[in-house]
């Protein structure tokens, strides 16, 4: 599923440029993705679209502190929660977008959500909302933790 999400980000500048689900499924199949992966990714994106257009029940105040439920802590490890706090403190996210990211992370089934996958979720939520991204934040989202840990040889 995550490979498909990255593929969509790389191939469609804006979420609005994405074709309808049936046509997109055919294009993804032609690109070599498996049917079950396509279905899972399209279902996840459909959930993102549905929740993005419906207002959240309670919009957090900008100066509020986010406490995570036990299920959220189990799904979002400390590196993911720390990265989310970093983005919010940097001004890249508002509280409503943060909640949308958490909701979409909780909607991921069958995968351990490591920091790399979490960055893909964040990227897709911001892509769907067509929010402008600072180039340093975008670089941070596109950087894989394996690249960060790789030794620099000169």
UniProtKB/Swiss-Prot annotation:
Q: Which InterPro entries match?
A: Smg
The record ties this protein, via Pfam families, to: DUF494 (PF04361)
- Show the coiled coil region(s): none
- Transmembrane residue ranges: none
HAMAP family per UniProt:
Smg (MF_00598)
> Which family does the similarity line name?
Belongs to the Smg family.
Identify this protein by name: Protein Smg homolog
> Where does this protein come from, organism-wise?
Aromatoleum aromaticum (strain DSM 19018 / LMG 30748 / EbN1) (Azoarcus sp. (strain EbN1))
Which classification does the entry list for the species? Bacteria, Pseudomonadati, Pseudomonadota, Betaproteobacteria, Rhodocyclales
Whichever gene encodes this chain, its name is smg
């Amino acid at each position: 599923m995550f490979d498909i999400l990255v593929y969509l980000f790389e191939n469609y500048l804006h979420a609005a440029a994405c074709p309808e689900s049936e046509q997109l499924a055919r294009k993804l199949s032609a690109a070599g993705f498996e049917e079950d992966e396509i279905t899972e990714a399209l279902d996840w994106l459909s959930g993102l679209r549905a929740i993005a257009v419906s207002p959240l029940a309670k919009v957090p105040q900008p100066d509020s502190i986010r406490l995570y439920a036990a299920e959220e802590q189990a799904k979002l490890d400390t590196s993911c929660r720390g990265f989310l706090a970093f983005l919010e403190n940097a001004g890249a996210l508002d509280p409503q977008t943060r909640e949308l990211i958490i909701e979409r992370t909780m909607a991921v089934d069958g995968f351990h959500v490591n920091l790399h996958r979490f960055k893909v979720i964040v990227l897709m939520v911001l892509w769907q909302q067509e929010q402008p991204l600072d180039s340093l934040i975008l670089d941070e989202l596109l950087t894989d933790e394996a690249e960060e840990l790789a030794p620099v040889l000169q």
